[in-house]
Every structure is written in C-alpha cells, then in structure tokens.
Amino acid sequence: MKLVTRYFLVLVFSLLVSSNAWAQWSSDPSKNLALADNNDGADQVQPKVKPLPNGGWYVSWFDADPKSPPPVGYSVYLQRLSAGGVERFKHDGIEVAHLSNSSTEDYGLDIDTSGNALLAFLDTREGANPQVTAAKMGPGGKALWGARGVQLTKGSVHSNTAPKVAGTSDGGVVVAWTSDSNTVLQKLDPNGKPLWGKGVVLSETGYYYFLADLHAADNGSVIVSWVRNHGFGSDSQLRANKLSATGKLLWGKKNVTIFDTGSLQFGHFPYFVPDGKGGAVFAWYTSSPALQCFAQHILANGSEAFPHNGSAASTNMTDVRVDPAASFRAATDEVFLVWTEEDANQTVNGIYAQKFGPKGARRWGQTGLVIVPLGTDSEILPSNVQVGDGALMFWIDMKGFGNASIQAARLQDNGKLKCAQFPVSTAMSNRGRPAADIVTATGLAAIAFEDDRIGNNGIYIQNVNRDCSLGQE
C-alpha cells in the first residue's frame, strides 16, 4: 500500500512539473503564451508589462470576470513570469483589487527596489466616487500593503482619473493622478506612509493639467508630464517637471515646456522614457498645424538637448504621421523613433523609423527609414525598445477585421536591418493595446497585448530574443 501511495505521489508531482513546464515562452507566433484566457464572454484588457532585473516580468491587466462575486466589474489582476516565461502565480493571474468599474482608464505598473510590483488604479470599493489606490504586491503574490492597499484620495468633492506609479531609487513610491483640473503627486515610504503631506499639486489658473506619464529618475526623484489646455477645443500642449525625493520642483516653478506651438491630437497623452541619467525622452504627435511626430530629450537639469518644440520625425510635407514611440540609447545619447506614416488622405499607411543624434539631428535621412511601405493594410500602434546598438520595433498589421498580426523588425545603429520583418503573433484575431519592454541586461524583449482569438479579449505575451528568435534560446 505504501508503495502504491508513493508511486501515486510521484506521478502527481511529475504531472504538475510537466504542466508547469508547458507554460513558458512560445517559439510559435501562432501560439503565444496566454496569461488570461477565460472564454466566458467577458474581456481581459489593457495589459502593462514591467521587466525585473533578474530577467523576470510582471504583467497587469483588467478582467471583467462574470463568475467573480458581485459587484462585477473590471478588476485589477497581476501575473509574475520567470525569465523563461513560466507563470509564478496561478494561471489567469491573482486579483489585486475586486472592482465594479464598468469601463477602464489608464493606470500604473512599476517595480520598487526590492522587486515588488507597484500598481495604482481607480478604486470603486470606497463608494460612488472612484478613489486613487496604490498597491504593493510581493514576488510571492502577497498584498504587502493589505487587501485594500493605500487609498490616496477620499470623499466625493474631487474627480480623480488615470493614476500612475513609480518606484523611486531610494525605495519609495510616488503616485500621480489628475484631480479635477490639477495634477497631484504623493510619495509613500516602503510601508505605504505618505511623505509629502497632502501631496504636491501642480496647477495653473485658467488651465487644466491632465496627467500624461510618470517615471522614476535619479536620487529618489521622479519626472512627471502632463497635457495643458484651457478647455475643450483649445490647444493641448505638453509640460513636465522633476520632483526631488522631498517633493521640491527641480525644474522650476514655471515647469519645462516640452511643446507649445500648435496642439497635440485630441485624447493624446504622450508617454515618455527615462534616459537613465536623470532626464527623459519624449515623443508626441500634433494635430495642428499638421499631423506630425516629434521627439525631445530633456536632460537631468531640465535643459533641452533638441531644439525647442522638438525635432520632427520627417520633413516630408506630403504625408502625415501619427502614434510615435521612442527608445533611448544611453551610451551614445541617441533616440530611436517609430511611427505610423500615412498619405495625406489617411487611406494608406506604413511603418517608418528615425534616429536622432544627441542634439536632435535626423540621422536616418530627412524623411526616415521605410520599414513597411505605404499600403492598404492598417499598420498601427507601433512601439520600440532599445537593444544592442539599435532598436527592436513592433507594430500591428491589420488586413481586416479579425485578421491582425503583430510584426517586428530590428534595426542597427546605421539603419540597416539586423532582422528583417518577422511575425510575433499570427493567430487569426483582432489585437490591441500592445505594451513592450526589455530586460536590459539580457536583451530579451517581451510584448503583451489584447487578443480575441478565444471569442472575447484575452491577455497574451510573446518574448523576442536578441537574435529575433522566439521562445527559449
């Protein structure tokens, strides 16, 4: 009997180990690693991805699981992956917060200096008016700030939207959000205790400050950006500042003007990337005077490395361009930009790229490099990560409804293709909201995305190795 029992336990253990080994990076672009694939008719949406220094990953998303206890809404979920793509939490992730949101807004994901996941989101658990909550989740999935996290707002007086979070180099956590017409920031210590009183409020009489992005910088500081306008229909422009570990405005009370001529496209809240030196690289596109993409590098002291209002991606005045994404090579102070190029009527489009030198000069020709020529497929939502001496660029190629794929190409510093266009995700489906990042130490990149191959949206992820192969090296 003991022998039978021992054999049974060994068999069960072997099956568990084998099944766990199956959940790893896929080498087949038609079979990407599924993180949340409940085909229950409810969507799993809006993934964010963050690499860990050890090569692992955190991925977060919203899930409106109809089987969850009422009230049913878009709840916050999290998964941790090993460097090999093995899920460390249960499949479909762990629930960070059970919410009743009927729709989603932007939110924040980052890591702290101890490798914990940090999340900031709108929280419906405290009443009718959504509040801003921050959560810290340990590598084992434990809620380190308790089941309800740290609530940063309260009451029904203020309207709060689109929070972001950043883990600072001194072990702290900064959360930013839009409150009415202002952008507000609060710093928390490792235990979740507020450090900046009632928060640092960025405001200007007669103007709205809508939070755009937030990232950690040097010496415990953060860089924050926002869209500035004075109401619907007015020009939207881009501002930024850097806050010290104690909340001091390091770039001055007048802030840094990233862009102040013309207007951002309506609804465009540009992300930026830290330069690793205390500064940041910004990319955005305008709707007036024309649909055009720009980049700017703001140095650690708040000065502009590129000309004021940024360097244009292309001097081609016939076409238009939208949706830029930037990456930065710290060793050479170069910026890589990828975007969607369109004809004047916006009936055909392609994927183009540009490299800027340290002072903003276009290095890949005055009109950029053509990765995908203008054509009838919709080439949308490009992103890129810096790798080697160049960049790895992703985009969605949509031939028609239900027939979209994720494609990629890797460019060298000289603009030549290190890897010609190759497929990353090819199952017949619609795809959206891709989020890409890279483990700098290993050069392994990953892109997470929404995908409706199961009938409703699920969350999938695919790695890309330095040699542009998929799966285990």
Q: Where would I find each of the regions flagged by the language model?
A:
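Extracellular, repeat-based ectodomains that mediate carbohydrate processing or recognition
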Residues: 24-473
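Bacterial N-terminal signal peptides
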Residues: 7-19
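Positively charged n-region of N-terminal signal peptides that target proteins for export
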Residues: 1-6
